[in-house]
Amino acid sequence: FLVDKIIIMGRPDEEETLLRVDAAINKKYRHADGTEMTISRVCWDTGGIDGEIVYQRSKKHGVFRVLPVKGASVYGKPVITMPKTRNQRGVYLCEVGTDTAKEILYARMKADPTPADEATSYAIRFPDDPEIFS
């Protein structure tokens, strides 16, 4: 289920922007049954910004909670490759097989819809709210 969509505008090298990112990572959600849910894992793309910023936030939030990732456009590469050891910066820099991930996601999005209360393996569920796509 897609639970939320958060867009954080600002410069990634400014602490004020990073504090808003921290708030999004630490946000709590309430399930319909009252159970509190937190975000247990975040992948943060290092492309396009100084990777050191992402590495520092990974260390701040926990190296297994915030995973720095970089794309690898190699057909057939696994969706994500978790290294066995930390890199020189002390974090686990994961590679994302972007072509493979897109192929899997697009295939799952083509699946016939099922009722929301019906358990469906590997289903992607979006809210019934057109604003989520804007």
Residue ranges of predicted features:
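Mg2+-dependent endonuclease catalytic cores in nucleic-acid-processing enzymes, primarily RNase H-like
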Residues: L2-F133
